[in-house]
Amino acid sequence: MALPLLEYKLSSQNHRVKSFGVADQNEDTPYIYRLEDVSSFTDIQNIIWAAYRQVFSEHEILRFNRQKHLESQLKSGLITVRDFIRGLAKSEAFYRLVVSVNNNYRLVDVVLKRLLGRSAYNKEEEIAWSIVIGTKGFDGFVDAIVDSDEYTQAFGDNTVPYQRKRLVDRPHNLVTPRYGEDFQETAGTVKTDWRFTLQNFYSRKFQERQLREGDPRKYTDMAAAIAPKGNYAQNIRAADLDYLNLVPSRTRRF
């Protein structure tokens, strides 16, 4: 028996303020892609790539992440834009890039931003939806979001989700990377990171470069091999020094 969604209080966000006007008339809102506006093959391609940008975020769009069977069904009119969004969120690529590298609380916030176009209202909502993930699984969570009344009222069957009524906020794809700090601390920086690639490249180029005679960098290995003995100060009091014998006498002949 699945647990019902816990109740949570709503907080004030831009999309809930009617005085901000219609999203289409807001100059800060990105172009809205609707299936009703399609009149050519290029238009349907634009809808497909807009959906990829929204679900996968712009910095994650790669050719091997494409879901060609879903694209074909959308082009043939077998599925709606809503089902296309649902399929992208349930794809293996999305699970590998987003789901597997986040805890449930952060995953809720990421999915709300990408599928509903808004942030989580508060921690209570994150907890409520995380329980849905724990009981129904991630696919059940996606179905609950895409089939919700909020999604239907905001986007319907034929509109690609977008960040609703963005005024001064930064775009979600710029403030919500695919994984959080906890995963980065656990996994660390892998050797395939571009920083290691650049470091190895320039190190190899530096080693292959012919240094001129007299260049100090030619003697770095020799300098590193030198192990001088430490000359530490002696712990002697001034009262213990024999000045008569230590200071040479001018009249004394050797």
From Swiss-Prot:
Q: Tell me one Pfam family matched here.
A: PBS_linker_poly
Q: Where in the cell is it found?
A: Cellular thylakoid membrane
Q: Does the keyword Thylakoid apply?
A: yes
Q: Which GO BP terms, alphabetically?
A: photosynthesis
Chief subcellular site?
membrane
Q: Which UniProt keywords apply?
A: Antenna complex, Membrane, Photosynthesis, Phycobilisome, Thylakoid
Per UniProt, residues of the PBS-linker domain are: 11-191
InterPro entries per the UniProt record, alphabetical = PBS_linker_dom (IPR001297), PBS_linker_sf (IPR038255), Phycobilisome (IPR016470)
Q: Thylakoid as a keyword?
A: yes
- Spell out the GO cellular component terms annotated for this protein, sorted alphabetically and separated by semicolons: phycobilisome; plasma membrane-derived thylakoid membrane
Q: How does it sit in the membrane?
A: Peripheral membrane protein
Can you tell which superkingdom this protein's organism belongs to? Bacteria
Protein purpose: Rod-core linker protein required for attachment of phycocyanin to allophycocyanin in cores of phycobilisomes. Linker polypeptides determine the state of aggregation and the location of the disk-shaped phycobiliprotein units within the phycobilisome and modulate their spectroscopic properties in order to mediate a directed and optimal energy transfer.
Which PANTHER family did the record assign?
PHYCOBILISOME 32.1 KDA LINKER POLYPEPTIDE, PHYCOCYANIN-ASSOCIATED, ROD 2-RELATED
Please give the family membership noted in the entry. Answer: Belongs to the phycobilisome linker protein family.
* Quaternary context: The phycobilisome is a hemidiscoidal structure that is composed of two distinct substructures: a core complex and a number of rods radiating from the core.
Q: What is this protein called?
A: Phycobilisome rod-core linker polypeptide CpcG3
Q: What is the lineage of its organism?
A: Bacteria, Bacillati, Cyanobacteriota, Cyanophyceae, Nostocales
